[in-house]
Amino acid sequence: MNWITNYVRPKINSMLGRREMPENLWIKDPSTGEMVFHKDLESNQFVIPSSGHHMRIKAKDRLRFFFDNGEYTTLEAPKVPLDPLKFRDEKKYIDRLKDYRSRTGMDDAIVNGLGTIEGLPIVATVQDFSFMGGSLGMGAGEAIIQGFEKAIELKRPFVLFASSGGARMQEGILSLMQLPRTTVAVEMLKEAGLPYIVVLTNPTTGGVTASYAMLGDIHIAEPGALIGFAGPRVIEQTIREKLPEGFQSSEYLMEHGMVDMVVSRLELKATIARLLKIMTKQPANSDAPAPQKPDADSKAA
């Protein structure tokens, strides 16, 4: 009877048993509630086909979609002290870091990539919101500076995709130090005469908007992105007034002159390639989609 109980019965159970469905097989559209098949979403760069809603995207996926043929080289993340303040809230900061590293496979919230877009060599830096809300700490700050320095070394244009909740509170003043440090790196790039394009994605808030994310030569925003220093709820509680509808959205900011254009993720590569070719005085691709421009009333404002 042992072979029946040990082999036959488990085999039958495995054949007849209910197969578990992966949790991430279907993705819910936050704007409409529609369920979208994961593979359909990924093939569309994580933009909902029906509504155009831009889902958050992992850094490595962002680079894969952005670079020619999905090919790029990443820079090794700089080594920094993990927890110099020995900070603890609900759990030790160092344990929280280890948890996020295990879940994301990343050292910190920044990934630097080297590759080409439409044949033009560039350096691209991506902030990943899935790693502690894309917060800016020593590791992230050092990686951003590394990206700027590599662009200067190779004499390449620099593109940064911002997505962050702001400074990393667990690192205190050491986190805030990254604001002036990254600002200096921006100035170094500009002194080298190299283009700097910033893509503001959802969300880009806090100290990031008080430093490198708003210092680009050109600022592009993805549709529907939340962009601002403090969140709308905090502002309403402070001034005790209701904010205008769509306040701090990418479209609102473009209408009021805070960003240069709002571009769908599906058109970002072609748009940025055309802009960089113009900025570096190379022949531009006439087939690239034209950027969205503010109307006359917006210009007057």
UniProtKB/Swiss-Prot annotation:
Q: Name one GO cellular component term.
A: acetate CoA-transferase complex
Give GO BP annotations, semicolon-separated: fatty acid biosynthetic process; malonyl-CoA biosynthetic process
Q: Name one GO molecular function term.
A: carboxyl- or carbamoyltransferase activity
Give the superkingdom in one word: Bacteria
Q: Which residues form the CoA carboxyltransferase N-terminal domain?
A: 25-294
Q: Does the keyword Coiled coil apply?
A: no
Query: Catalysed reaction(s)?
Result: N(6)-carboxybiotinyl-L-lysyl-[protein] + acetyl-CoA = N(6)-biotinyl-L-lysyl-[protein] + malonyl-CoA
Keywords of the record, alphabetical order, are:
ATP-binding, Cytoplasm, Fatty acid biosynthesis, Fatty acid metabolism, Lipid biosynthesis, Lipid metabolism, Nucleotide-binding, Transferase
Task: State which pathway it belongs to.
Answer: Lipid metabolism; malonyl-CoA biosynthesis; malonyl-CoA from acetyl-CoA: step 1/1
Keyword flag Transferase = yes
Q: Where in the cell is it found?
A: Cytoplasm
Q: Which SUPFAM superfamilies match?
A: ClpP/crotonase
Q: Which Pfam families match?
A: Carboxyl_trans
Enzyme Commission numbers on file: 2.1.3.15
Assembly and oligomerization? Acetyl-CoA carboxylase is a heterohexamer composed of biotin carboxyl carrier protein (AccB), biotin carboxylase (AccC) and two subunits each of ACCase subunit alpha (AccA) and ACCase subunit beta (AccD).
So what does this one do?
Answer: Component of the acetyl coenzyme A carboxylase (ACC) complex. Biotin carboxylase (BC) catalyzes the carboxylation of biotin on its carrier protein (BCCP) and then the CO(2) group is transferred by the transcarboxylase to acetyl-CoA to form malonyl-CoA.
Q: What protein family does this chain belong to?
A: Belongs to the AccD/PCCB family.
Q: What is this protein called?
A: Acetyl-coenzyme A carboxylase carboxyl transferase subunit beta
**Encoding gene per record:** accD
